[in-house]
Amino acid sequence: MKIIKAKDYEDMSRKAANIISAQVILKPDCVMGLATCSTPIGAYKQLAAWYEKGDVDFAEVSTYNLDEYRGLSHDDPQSYHYFMRENFFDHINIDLNNTHVPDGSNPDAAAACSEYDKIVAAAGYPDLQLLGIGNNGHIGFNEPDDHFSKGTHCVDLTESTIQANSRLFDSIDDVPRQAYTMGTQTIMYARMILVVANGEAKAQAVHDMCYGPVTPECPASILQLHTNCVVVADEAALSLCK
């Protein structure tokens, strides 16, 4: 696991965007796994700015997002499909037919998850998987548990995750209680993993991810076993990594 220290959120975003753009430039038809938390927004904005300048071209890129709230349709303003269009896809030249997010509107969890696993596998899995990390060490919506998950599955969100995500909703009561998410096994199939983290609230999770025991109690700790994982984090998020 390689750790790149950034001064602050803006520096973290630019460093992460540099890695992502390098992947696109080196392999224009690359498969990208994308994250839908708030941490990567700065990187998405930087990539969109570079696209506007003609520095990077997303025309041949295909993307597969980690997760989606169960029960939300693609056009729901709180859905991650909507989030990706608002924060990234609508600002670059990507073919929307090549963008993929789990179908949160499908009430049949088993069918929705199985279908998403099939399309990710058919794409050959991501060349680069972008991840954020939750305060409790979750990646995607893989919450702390007594075992690591495999493929895409339906999860009950923990109270800490519901609380953390409530800032994006009018009320905590509006936050969905379940989500569809890629499993840790699927994430680990990516050829490169890029984790972004910022802020003091992430410090313990980042420390446990990088230096703690590999345990499903901190799902991100499994990334220690990946052969090509890069962590880009600001000084606050790395404050416990001495």
What feature does the model see in each segment?
Residues G124-S149:
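Glycine-rich phosphate-binding loop
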Residues G33-C37, N65, P102-D103, L130-I133, ...:
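Short beta-strand segments
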Residues L26-E52:
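Glycine-rich N-terminal segment of FAD-binding domains in flavoprotein oxidoreductases
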Residues M1-M32:
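N-terminal glycine-/serine-/threonine-rich phosphate-binding loop
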Residues G140-T184:
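Class I SAM-dependent methyltransferase SAM-binding "motif I" and its flanking Rossmann-like core
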Residues Q46-D57, Y80, P144-H153, V214:
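A glycine- and small-aliphatic-rich helix-loop capping segment at beta-alpha/alpha-beta transitions
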Residues V56-Q129:
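Ligand-binding beta-strand-loop-alpha-helix segment within the catalytic cores
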Residues M182-Q185, Y189-K242:
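ATP/nucleoside-binding phosphotransfer catalytic cores, i.e., glycine-rich phosphate-binding loops
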